[in-house]
């Protein structure tokens, strides 16, 4: 039995995530399975505002933005798995553990984001995340995200 790939285009992503330019860091979802995993891409362009200061002579995509891109991917997986937050709820990044940066990411690279759902306990979800460029891991981390009323 084969399973059809599930994808999301940018319009569908914007319907789920509250982030907008310059902070929307997921361009396309290439595959996902509810309550299991999500794969997405982030195209890194020299035209992004962070490159004016990080670093002008040798532009490098900030590691914290790689982690944020992975967190946004976890949000997409959570929303497709358990439903989008209510109007009085917020889904936010709660913690990062075991973050490792292995190679710099530069303009022209395409980040492949892979997040895996591990468990949910009292509204706090645990995920493993990996970011790759050309098949090589550039970043990995454990991410926790929380869904809370405000």
Curated annotation (Swiss-Prot):
Pfam families: FabA. It comes from the Bacteria. It catalyses: a (3R)-hydroxyacyl-[ACP] = a (2E)-enoyl-[ACP] + H2O. It is found in: Cytoplasm. GO terms for biological process: fatty acid biosynthetic process; lipid A biosynthetic process. The keyword Chloroplast does not apply. It is an enzyme of class 4 (lyase). Keywords: Cytoplasm, Lipid A biosynthesis, Lipid biosynthesis, Lipid metabolism, Lyase. Its EC number is 4.2.1.59. GO terms for cellular component: cytoplasm; membrane. The active site is at 54. GO terms for molecular function: (3R)-hydroxyacyl-[acyl-carrier-protein] dehydratase activity. Belongs to the thioester dehydratase family. FabZ subfamily. Involved in unsaturated fatty acids biosynthesis. Catalyzes the dehydration of short chain beta-hydroxyacyl-ACPs and long chain saturated and unsaturated beta-hydroxyacyl-ACPs. This is 3-hydroxyacyl-[acyl-carrier-protein] dehydratase FabZ.
